[in-house]
Amino acid sequence: MDITQKNKRDGTEVTERIITETVTTRLTSLPPKGGTSNGYAKTGSLGGGSRLEKQSLTHGSSGYINSSGSLRGNASTSSYRRAHSPASTLPNSPGSTFERKTHVTRHGTYEGSSSGNSSPEYPRKEFASSSTRGRSQTRESEIRVRLQSASPSTRWTELDDVKRLLKGSRSASVSPTRNSSNTLPIPKKGTVETKVVTASSQSVSGTYDTTILDANLPSHVWSSTLPAGSSMGTYHNNITTQSSSLLNTNAYSAGSVFGVPNNMASCSATLQPGISTSSSVFGMQNNLAPSSSTLSHGMAATSTAYGVKKNMPQSPTAVSTGVSTSAASTTNVQNDDLLHKDCKFLILEKDNTPAKKEMELLIMTKDSGKVFTASPASVAATSFSEDTLKKEKQAAYTDTYLVSEANGDVKTVTAKGNGASADIHGYDHRRGGGGGGGSGGALGSGAAGGGGKGSWGAAPTWCPCGSWCSWWKWLLGLLLTWLLLLGLLFGLIALAEEVRKLKARVEELEKMRGRLSYNEKMERSSQDSVQGVAPRLGEGLGKSELDDYNLEDVWQFMKVRLMTEQENGNLRGSPGPKGDMGVQGPKGDRGFPGTPGIPGPLGHQGPEGPKGQKGNVGEPGMEGPMGQRGREGPMGPRGEPGPPGFGEKGDRGDAGKPGIPGPPGVPGSVGPKGSIGPQGLRGEVGLPGIKGDKGPMGPPGPKGDQGEKGPRGLTGEPGLKGLPGAVGEPGAKGAMGPAGPDGHQGPRGEQGLPGMPGTRGLPGPSGDPGKPGLTGPQGPQGIPGTPGRPGVKGEPGAPGKIMTSEGSSTITVPGPPGPPGAMGPPGPPGAPGPVGPAGLPGQQGPRGEPGLAGESFMGSSSSFSEVLSTQGIDLRGPPGPPGPPGPPGEGLPGPPGPPGSLLTSSETFFSGPPGPPGPPGPKGDQGPPGPRGHQGERGFPGLSGSGSSSLGLNLQGPPGPPGPQGPKGDKGDPGVPGAPGIPGGPSRGGSSSSTTFMQGPPGPPGPPGPPGSLSSSGLEIQQYISDYMQSDSIRPYLSGVQGPPGPPGPPGPVTTITGETFNYSELASLVVSYLQTSGYNIGTSSTSISSEDILAALRRDDVRQYLQQYLMPQGAGGDWFLQSLDYAELSNRILSYMSSTGVSIGLPGPPGPPGLPGTSYEELLSLLQGSEFRGIVGPPGPPGPPGLPGSSWSSISTEDLSSYLQTAGLSSIPGPPGPPGPPGPRGPPGISGALATYAAENSDSFRSELISYLTSPDVRSFIVGPPGPPGPQGPPGDTRLVSTDSSYSRSGSSSSFSRDTSYSSSMGIGGASGGSLGEAGAFGMDMGRGYGAAAESGMYGGNGRFGTSFAGGLDYNELAVRVSESLQRQGLLQGMAYTVQGPPGRPGPQGPPGISKIFSAYSNVTEDLMDFFRTYGAIPGPPGQKGEMGIPGPKGERGPAGPPGPRGHKGEKGDKGDQFYIGRRRRSIAVKP
């Protein structure tokens, strides 16, 4: 009956959303069990539980809602129902369970006792006390029995444990009684109801089945269950194990007994999470929490408040799937567990939603054995949904509710209020554990368990985290959201405030404006009215009455009238508008103090005040004074004598201190004199002093040698300078002197050159139109082109490599030729052909031979001076010395690029120039003189230079420009060999190589010298030379020669299939250099080489391999590159390169001729020497270095030279210097010390001179610009050139060097000037180094070789065009372009001699230069640049005072002060209105 009633009540109360059926089932079990409890709790529920139920409703489980309907009944039912519709039944079930004493029977064991309470969890006492049913005592005993007998787990056997669990559960339950404390007895009133609910909610009560417990999980689950928090965990465990069993066994009666524990046990593991959540709320909650994790979806929420609440969360899963099947699924699991454990629990789940079946299962028979079907399954479903909806609402009630939710009893608790809650707690635990644990037993622990967590901190039903969402996270989220909203709100408020203020301000302004306009109008109107009154009046009067009167009278009358009126004050108009507030007046003076007021009368005597209260007792008075001293008492009797004292005898005293010592005794008498000792041994002889260091060798010595040469240096002046003496050797060159005339012709040649330039001009245009245009010129060389192909092979860079390897060793020189190959492009400069005349000088080249002999720098000196003068005047002239290379002249074509390469090392510019030498090619005939170059044997020393030859050659490259002088060079030839050594070397090496070296003559360019200096202070010399070369004064010379070469360069570039620019000139120079290095002889005779010969050479495998290596860097397969090469073009280029460079195997001679043009070598040298520009001589050196190696260089390694040259940045200068080269050889020795010394001593003046000279426009253009020309080859592709250079440097130290410098300098800026400066270094040389250092495109270091340059994709033609334009602009190309170009390259080597000279006897050179300058004055360079503004002079003294000025006009009278006036005005205005 109770159950039924309960159900009814539940139904009524629960009816909320849940189905009545649920209600019925859920409570039924419980009520029967604890009818009392049911009645009591339920009824209580109505009262106290009402709230609980309400909470239930809030939870949103229909069950709960129902429970709301009937407070107590509902509460417990709700829980159950919550779990499932059957949850309502569940309470019954738990009841039944409780009733069921045998755990085996879920229904009966726990029904009576358990049902009432939530589950075993309510302590028996609790049950008894809590349940109104009167189950309390009985219940408790019942529970004990059940626990002991029915709980499979040993845990439950302990009554105390059970009690504790129950209490804990209860405490956990919603009821306010202890939350989770073991002793938490739910209020008895509440408890009963709760109990009922619990029983129903938890199968536990009803389905306490011992077997289930045993089978599933022992009661141990309950243990967990009982404690609100921990029991849940345990429940879960039990549930997990029990879940299937529980489900299977409808009667979780055993669980019922301790509904809580059982429920817990039945709870699936999944439930555990849920339970834990719920556990936090109450024991009941725990039950809820126990809903499996799966349950936690749904259950989590339910657990939060009660079974009901739990249901809510469960609703998502538990409800639908949970009860019946999902042992695993959260909700389901819980449901299953609950069912198994406790029908109620299951029902709870079901109640949640879904499993009506389960609910039925859950509903167990009461103790009576009735099984309550979960007819309210439908209710459960509904409940669940509602629960979900209401869950949040119920949050507030969660605490209390939880209890009810946890167990069916909770529902009861609801009815009962707190007490009910407590009971529910117990159940809750059980239910949670059982998985049915949800809020109320009836609700269905599972559902409740799942939702249990929902209680406080449980996540909403819809939360995927289910039980794992902690309330604080939600809270935090809400807080943050609120904060954000508040922030926005405040922001908006602030904004609104601002807007309001602005509006107010605007309104205020508007009002003010309105007021002002109004005032104005008023004023105006008042004025009008005042003025208008009389007139109108007059008119009227006149017309009406006064017509007859005299107007005068009328007016008189009016006046009198008005006056009287005014006096009477009748005319006063209406008050005008209020005037504007006047400006605040000044503050008044402080007033005088007022007179003191009269004293007021005396006041009346006040009435007597009331009598005061009695005073407090006064403080005790102070202590009285001390009394008098008492009299002394009488003396006492005498004391008796004391006993005799006794003591032991004392120890003996210490001995006294020793007495003071007596006075000293009288001194003894003097002893007899000792005998004389034996004579001492004689001292050893001192060590010999350290031998003094050998004094430094006087530089003069070397000069002495040169002195001999001096004689040769018929050149009187040079002769004076020891150097000139050396020049004397050149005396042979002196013979060249005639060539000197040639040199004059050179000038003519220059004119010719200009002519050439004209020609060049054509090329220039071509260049402009299409970089190809330049290439076009090369086209003519087409024949050589054929060789070109082989060149390609060479190109691969094998030569480069060779050069590289040789660079350090010996014939790096060949390498340089490779670069000249680049010059090939210069070939077009063929125009330089005119230079050919220089070729004549080439004949002089033989004289050059003496130059060789001239080892003495003198000889080269003179030639160098010639070169310089030539450069200054006719570059060709100086080149004359290079002339020796002239023989290679045939190589004239070479001019194009090869020379450039040579130049490259010394000066990038030259590389270009060599091209021009092409014209010298004709001189090639002179080529034979080239052999004279052999004479240059001196050069041989150069040969040693040869070793450094590579350097020398490279250096020579720069000289290349001088090459043109090459013709003169013939004489120079010999000279060259001397200096260049390289030339000599080549001669030695073979006609072809010697020829190549012959070009060396240009080497003269002292550059080599620098190398010598390298040994001692290469850097200094490099610096000097580079500075010097850059100086404007010397630049003209250098530029003159070098410039020309540039043009040729352009042709070099060619665009490859890949679209990359390919520099045939460069390639040609590479190939030539490679061939030379490899000792291969092109053609049968050194004088004439046909393009076919070259082509044949190019076809050689080794050459192809070399080319392939050279080209590889480009990234394209070397093979393809080779295939894509136009061998004809390459051979032409090579031919032109060789001819221009004089490198051609033996063709070099031609270049020499160009050298002739220009001042004679000796002149130049002497000029330079005289002008302190020895540095200049030196610069040529770079080319020279190669030569130097031979004689003086023996002490200098090629690497040193090359590095020096590269660092020196002499490459650009090289060209002109070349001539000096011959002397170079000697120089080297000197170089080490002398140059260094000189540099050290005269570094400033030397540098300044050099700089001034080199920086002179002419020189600069030459050095920077002209050299650029060599660059021209580079021009085709600036980068490429650079690359090429680097490639050269890589391939051969000397070759690479020369090539690098020459190209790099010319290329550096892509212009004539650019070249010399190069981006990396001051000069080509520097640049070359730069390359190595990655200064320029990193070709050098980067394995750039051609590849890099190609990668750069430079357009050589374009570059050539630019360079040529630049040269033309500077007038560099006029005579020298061609001359310089080819041949000079070779001559470069001679350059070294110049340097050598400087090196060997720097002082000599200095003297020579100085003499020269003294005699001729500084080399006339272009006018110096405008000096910097002088420092402002000191401020002059103050001058005498000037006469007084005229008297000024009288000033106008000042305006009257405004203030007064304004005040007046204001007043008047004020009156006006």
Curated annotation (Swiss-Prot):
Topological category with respect to the lipid bilayer: Single-pass type II membrane protein
A GO molecular-function descriptor: extracellular matrix structural constituent conferring tensile strength
Region (Nonhelical region (NC16)), start-end ranges: 1-572
Superkingdom of source: Eukaryota
Disordered as annotated region, ranges: 1-155, 168-188, 567-1017, 1173-1234, 1261-1308, 1417-1473
Region (Necessary for interaction with DST and for the recruitment of DST to hemidesmosome): 146-231
Name by which UniProt lists this protein: Collagen alpha-1(XVII) chain
Species name: Bos taurus
Phylogenetic classification of the source organism: Eukaryota, Metazoa, Chordata, Craniata, Vertebrata
